[in-house]
Amino acid sequence: MASDSRRGTGSPKMKGRENAKDTLCRNVTIYGRCRYEDKGCVYNHDPNKTNSAYQSDSKRRLNVDSPSFTPSLLSSNGSSPTSSSATLKKTTTISPKAANAAPFQPRGISSRSNASTPSARAESAAPDWSVAEVQEFVPQGFETSHMASLQGNGNGPVPSTSPFDPFVTTSNPLAAANAVGPVQANPFSPDTAAAALGGATFFTGQTGFQPVQYHLYAPIGPHSQNTLGYQRNVHDLFLPNDFREELQKKAAATLQTLPNTQLPAQVDYFHSLVPLDLNHQKNATIFGFPSWVYKAQSSKDGNFYALRRLEGFRLTNEKAIRSVQAWKRVCNGSVVTVHDAFTSRSFQDSSLIFVTDYHPLSKTLAEQHLSAGNRFQGRSNTHIPEQVLWGYMTQIANALKAIHSNGLAAKIIDPSKILLTGRNRIRLNACAIMDVVQFDTQRSIADLQHQDLVSFGQLIVTLGANSPSVMHNPTKAMEHFTRAYSPQMKNSVFWLLNSMQKDQDHTIDIFITGISSQLMSTFDSALHMDDQLTSDLSRELENGRLVRLMTKLNFINERPEYEHDRQWSENGERYFLKIFRDYVFHQVDAHGDPVVDLGHVLACLNKLDAGSDEKITLVSRDEQSCFIVSYKEIKKALESSFQALLKPTRRVH
């Protein structure tokens, strides 16, 4: 009994398959033949026989005359496996209504039982199939919101939308987040529509952007709108040539000296005098005294100033020269700033010196538009456009506004005393001189300010007629001015010329109100000019940084005084700094000719300053040593070597 019980609980013997002769042997499928075919293998070894048997069986099973499938009822869940097999009732007959029964279609799948449910209960559960509940497998359409974040600490979900585009924003972010995404086709479906997509399903469009390169120049606006995205010109990379030449010429004019001159070596605290007058003939028309203009350098601050000298002036009242103190408070962009005034005998006479700002390469309006000082006297002057003339009027009005607000009067508004310091940029000059020269003249400030307005109108008429003597015939001058310019310009000039009338109130504030529209135009032009200068300045912003890098490299490389110093050896990090210098500046082409490439130098220095992870190959001059280092390592070596250079003087061992 014991042996029988042990035999009953042993592993059951594997039963042979009844349809083994119709099953194709796996060895034939895998290896092409079965080595056990003649040694008792019971499976089929003829693939053709298997296919024919399968086709015949399919024809028999898919016959339209065959009855529909009617599953038998299983036992209840509570019955045991033995009792259920005993009481299982098999249907051996077919109902007459089976001919009209609908074909079998799966309806749904039942919910799976828990892991703790017995296997018999799971087998007895009635399956309920539903195709609609089974989701198709779509690789590109999976929901990424349920996945952990691939970046950061994993707390946030991966966004299911497309990559962020800074140039395309949604008007309603909440609506965009809740919106249903587009339905993608199933690439594994045999549908012809999905097949027509080809490879487009697997290779969707990518709209990612590269990160900002902080070691490159930042393109600050304004930007040119008439070029395409891939087009570049020289002005996009460097300072405009005309602007650069203008600045260089002004710098050269500022530093200009005149050796072997008969001018005094020093006038008070100024030295290095250079005459600025184009006409060497004495002219006392404006001030009543011959005047000369010099450029000089101050011994106090080292800056350059313009000195206007009134020859032969004798100061009789000390209060007269103190009136210049009021002009020091006038700080306006359209007025040349007055810094000081003093008398001097450095020119072997009694002279009055006025110290003002120096604007290199500046011209007067008379030299620019009235042929004053021009060697081609017979050449006719060009007509001044109305917009340029409006610009002059707004700037002079700005200057008079500042002067009159301080209780002063310009007294001199003459084309020969108005400086053109830039393109259509003018400044009133020599304003404080008449306050000293005519100090004893008794005249009210209101009358002097009205006279400024009249002189203002005469200046505009003179510039519009392109002739300095046009005011000798005012009627003819106004006829020409009326034909050449708009009615608004004509009315403004008429208003200025009639400022001396007592029956009307004429102030510079009323005049500014009348030309407010032109003031806005000039202000807009000034804003555009400011944007342009800011853009040009941004291109030169990094030049100092690159110069510092080159300076550090030259400080470190090839120092002969430390050649035998053990602490300053070029075998370590300083050695590939030396080779890096050759890599940047001493490259040659395939023919051995030097490569002069400014772009290569700028790119290398920018990457060095940023500490990029990009690696480069450095080869020694004898081609016996080779280093593969990154810009980050080179930057670290550069900083450590430079800091070591700044340490106290070391002793040579």
UniProtKB/Swiss-Prot annotation:
Biased composition (Low complexity): 68-95
InterPro entries (alphabetical): Kinase-like_dom_sf, PAN3, Pan3_PK, Prot_kinase_dom, Znf_CCCH
Domain of life: Eukaryota
Region (Knob domain): 556-653
Zn finger (C3H1-type) location: 19-48
Primary residence: cytoplasm
GO molecular function ontology, one term from the record: ATP binding
Listed GO biological process terms: mRNA processing; nuclear-transcribed mRNA poly(A) tail shortening
Comment block on domains: The N-terminal zinc finger binds to poly(A) RNA.
PANTHER family noted in UniProt: DEADENYLATION COMPLEX SUBUNIT PAN3 (PTHR12272), PAN2-PAN3 DEADENYLATION COMPLEX SUBUNIT PAN3 (PTHR12272:SF11)
Record text on subunit structure and interactions: Homodimer. Forms a heterotrimer with a catalytic subunit pan2 to form the poly(A)-nuclease (PAN) deadenylation complex. Interacts (via PAM-2 motif) with poly(A)-binding protein pab1 (via PABC domain), conferring substrate specificity of the enzyme complex.
Protein name: PAN2-PAN3 deadenylation complex subunit PAN3
Originating species: Aspergillus terreus (strain NIH 2624 / FGSC A1156)
